[in-house]
Every structure is written in structure tokens, then in C-alpha cells.
Amino acid sequence: MSEFKRLMRLKLKMKQKRPEFKRQDWFKCSRIGTSWRRPFGKHSGMRIGLTHRAAVATVGYRGPALVRGLHPSGLQDILVNNVKELVALNPEIQGARIAATVGKRKRIEIVKKANELGIRVFNVSKQKQDEFLSL
């Protein structure tokens, strides 16, 4: 388990050091936005990797393979649409994220069932959980 914790800490450090990858010339035209697109231009300094240009997303920025894609808590992030899907989760290694399309009534049911089963719900705050449990 200590190896897992070490890798999670390493993942956090790498994330803090990782630059914010922005699209080439994002500051010149507001309509293109900052979302990452790889530069393909023939004379692009960013593509070539000139030091005074923005960073380009490459393999070296990836986190450790064993903890890649996990929630910062160390649990797998599983999307849940109903109580039936929630029951199938393993609370030791998986956590729930309630889908955006789920309404309030079903959301309350999911939170109550998750509390019974000891499953962590990532996208519902503690205040909301307390509110839902009191209903």
C-alpha cells in the first residue's frame, strides 16, 4: 500500500509541475479558445519546441501508470445512473459519480443507498449529502 501512496503523491507533484497546455496563438483570437490542439505548421516554433514557446503535450508529462485515471482519493471514478449500478460497486476501490442527467429524486435515492453501502459519492458535497439524508 505504501507504493500506491507514493505513486499518488508523485502523481500530485507531477500535476502541479505540469504546464497548462494551450492552443497555439490562443491569445491572438478569442474565438478559437485555449483548448489544446497540436501545432502542425511548417514553421511553427511551438511544434519544433523552441524554449521561448509554450509547452507541447508529450508522453513525458503522463503520470504513473498504476494510478493514472484514478480520482485524487485513490478510488476509481465510476459513473452511476441509478441505484442498480451503485450496488455493483466495490466501496474499497471504487467511488461513484452521479451522472448529470439524473434528476433530484433519483439523486436522493442514490445518495441514501451509497451512504448505506459506504460508497463515496464524488460530485455531491457533504452539505448536500446531509440535506438528502435528512429528507
Swiss-Prot record:
This is Large ribosomal subunit protein eL32. GO terms for cellular component: cytosolic large ribosomal subunit. The lineage of its organism: Archaea, Methanobacteriati, Methanobacteriota, Methanomada group, Methanococci. HAMAP family: Ribosomal_eL32. GO terms for biological process: translation. InterPro entries: Ribosomal_eL32, Ribosomal_eL32_arc, Ribosomal_eL32_CS, Ribosomal_eL32_sf. It comes from Methanococcus maripaludis (strain C5 / ATCC BAA-1333). The keyword Lipoprotein does not apply. Belongs to the eukaryotic ribosomal protein eL32 family. Keywords: Ribonucleoprotein, Ribosomal protein. It comes from the Archaea. Pfam families: Ribosomal_L32e. SMART domains: Ribosomal_L32e. One of its GO terms (molecular function) is structural constituent of ribosome.
